[in-house]
Amino acid sequence: MCSLSNEITHPTIDVDAVRAKINDDSVRLIDVRREEEYNQGHIPNAVNLPLASLLSGDSPESVVKLFEEMGIGDSTEVVVYDDTFGALASRVAWTLQYIGHKNVALLEVTYLQWKEIGLKTSTEKPNIKPAKHSLNLNSDIMATAEYLESAKEKDNVVLIDNRERLNFLE
């Protein structure tokens, strides 16, 4: 799946803002690293969502259910982070925006940077209450095959494949 850059943005949130909201029940932090890494330490109150769980081709309804089980409702403020400078986190943020979630941001630092500057980490998993989330697909941010086919013929459109080199060569 691709996103149309003029239709979607992922604002960032700074460390101080996250620290101030870490215990706020209306905020959900999502750690997109592998489960083993999450279990070794994460930002307090963060839930784990390995990216592979979103890439299995599930229906939008299944994706909404997954986020609901993580305590993400329509009004939940979501902060996503990873250890790849946003490469994985941005995919989760895009997915949230695709299902119609309005309030999502990327943490401006990686987990490793968070840890290196001496901020608090935890190995405890938070107690999560499931939430209710609507499904309002934002199909304008999906670049379909038809869109790409017509866009490649236009002079004012630049198509950029931002996959990592190994994924691009597969």
What does each model-identified segment do?
Residues 2-7, 54-154:
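Thiolate-centered catalytic microenvironments shared by cysteine-dependent enzyme domains
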